[in-house]
Amino acid sequence: MNPQYKKGVLELCVLSLLKKRNCYGYEISEYLSEHIDIADGTVYPILRKLKADGLLTTYLQEESGGPPRKYYALTKLGRETYQTDRAEYLKFAQTVQTLLKEEEEANDKK
C-alpha cells in the first residue's frame, strides 16, 4: 500500500482508539500494527504531535511489577477534532469510492 495513504489517516486512527479508551503508547502501537502495516516507532511522533496540538493529555499510572506507564487521553479539543476529521474523512472516502466505481463502470462499457 502507498505509504501516503496510511500517513494521512494514522492520526485519525489514533484519535479513534483513544475515543474508546485511554491507552499507553505501546498499546496504541500494537493495536494499529494489528490492522495497518506500520513501522516500529511510527506512533510516538504522532502522539507527540497530537499532544503538542492540544488534542491529547497524558498521565502516569502505576503498574504492578514495573515502572509507571504513560497513558494518553483525548482532551475536549481532541474529541471535537476527532468528530470533525472523521466526518471529513468519511465524506472524502465516499467521494473516492464513487469516482473509482464510475471509472470501473466506464471501462466495463468499452
Summary of predicted features, one role per range:
Residues 2-44, 61:
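N-terminal helix-turn-helix DNA-binding core of bacterial DNA-binding proteins
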Residues 45, 49:
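Alpha-helical DNA-recognition elements
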Residues 54:
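Glycine-centered, phosphate/nucleic-acid-interacting loop/turn motifs that mediate DNA/RNA or nucleotide
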Residues 58:
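Short beta-strand "wing" residues that participate in macromolecule-binding interfaces
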Residues 63-86:
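Basic, amphipathic "hinge/linker" alpha-helix immediately C-terminal to the N-terminal HTH DNA-binding motif
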Residues 80-110:
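Amphipathic alpha-helical dimerization/coiled-coil segments
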